[in-house]
Amino acid sequence: MISATQLRPGMVIKFNNELYSIFKMEHRTPGNLRGFVQVKMRKLSSGTMIEHRFSSEDRVERAALEEHEMEYLYDDGEYFYFMNTENYEQMHLTKDILGDSVEFLIPQLKVNIEFYEGKPISVELPPTVDLTVVETEPGIKGASVSNVTKPAKLETGLVVQVPPFINEGEKIRVSTAEGTYQERA
């Protein structure tokens, strides 16, 4: 159990017999009233966001999570297959658990998967991923860095805005947090 004032974004807590991931936390002490912690959190089972106000004295149960490094192998349309890099055991996950992470998954990508009581609950991607451009308008010769961008479809189906000098077949580095172009890879 931890104090509500110790909550931080990214932590997973058990609240009302459900697992929640802390999205945003703000500690407030208005005037001469008792302090409280305003928390915005995401229910891991359904993905719904809720807000809750904890008293500064409240105690919250932090979920004991196990983290394993896994390597993405392939998908068959329904399941996404991963291999544990320590013991080579394979497992599959559904798109419900992976969420938007599927837009960045390419074979041999190493990710961290968090488990609670033996069940996978979330996937942590690396900060950036190198992906190949499969469809975009032809590049403009002599184009340099500017505010002008064009859409580019990547090998995973993700569409990002790229500078005009990027062509089909090129590898680019994409931020997994924002889903945006970073640089050529």
Predicted feature locations:
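Acidic-enriched and Gly/Ser
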Residues: I2-A185
